[in-house]
Regions:
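Acidic-histidine catalytic/liganding microenvironments
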Residues: 45, 87, 213
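Solvent-exposed loop/turn segments connecting transmembrane beta-strands
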Residues: 86-87, 186
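Conserved short beta-strand edge segments in small beta-sheet-based binding/regulatory domains
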Residues: 89-103, 215-227
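A contiguous, mid-protein "functional segment" used to position or interact
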Residues: 207-211, 218
Length: 243
């Protein structure tokens, strides 16, 4: 498996509760600024390596965004979760957190180019701009578990599956492929995949191909179609060496 060197990933299903929208504009602004200042301090103290959000095209109740957050240590991940839920801002959020390790199985490493680092937005991240999605791509988030009786996280594949998916990814210009394996597997999913395409049609076709039984992976799956959430802004949150 091709793994990131050490480190831990926080996977976060999040959103805002309805009670947030009953606050005044002044309260929202004050709570948001306090929250941003706190989170940026945690990011710097614990050497945040990545903060990437994906907004669901169709929210599922209070669950609106999926996040992948990388730290070099468990201590950083724990500190981030505590800070994110801290009041007053934290009272108005929806939180589901999972700890994971990232790494692709060898059979699919060549399906997508190595992702390059995103150029952060210029300016002070404490000054939050108007945030929006990046409409230049669609990211499929796939939650998957093996069939009954398999070891958690295992995914047996056939040669036919590898050949078919590899050809599809090349034809449709797969931009990025990542996998995260949960440290504590859930009843319905053991790992998460991110597959990014430039075209919505390609993302939709990838979902249908993964759902097919032809590759012999009788796995339980659920999918969410997303767009990257203000990627250049949040790239500016990562740890910076002090000069």
């Amino acid at each position: 498996m091709s793994e990131r060197d050490g480190g831990i990933t926080v996977l976060y299903k999040g959103g805002r509760l309805a009670s947030w929208h009953r606050l005044s504009a002044a309260e929202k602004k004050a709570y948001e600024q306090e929250h941003v200042d706190l989170m940026l301090a945690v990011a710097q103290q614990h050497r945040l390596q990545r903060l990437e959000g994906f907004r669901l095209l169709a929210p599922q109740g209070d669950y609106e965004r999926f996040w992948a957050i990388d730290f070099p240590s468990l201590e950083g991940a724990e500190a981030w979760i505590r800070a994110e839920m801290a009041p007053p801002y934290g009272r108005y959020g929806y939180y589901e957190y999972y700890l994971a390790r990232s790494g692709l199985p060898e059979y699919c490493v060549a399906w997508a180019p190595q992702a390059g680092g995103l150029v952060p937005q210029t300016g002070d991240p404490r000054e939050v701009p108007v945030l929006d999605v990046d409409r230049n791509s669609v990211v499929v988030v796939m939650f998957e578990r093996g069939e009954v009786g398999q070891v958690a996280g295992d995914k047996p594949v056939t040669e036919e599956y590898v050949a078919e998916m590899g050809a599809f990814c090349q034809e449709h210009g797969l931009l990025r492929l990542e996998r995260f394996q949960l440290i504590a597997p859930q009843a319905e999913w053991h790992h998460v995949w991110l597959a990014e395409f430039a075209a919505f049609e390609s993302a939709e076709a990838w979902v249908q191909l993964e759902r097919g039984p032809g590759h012999g992976c009788l796995s339980e799956r659920s999918f969410a179609l997303t767009r990257k959430w203000a990627p250049a802004y949040f790239a500016g949150w990562t740890y910076k060496e002090e000069s």
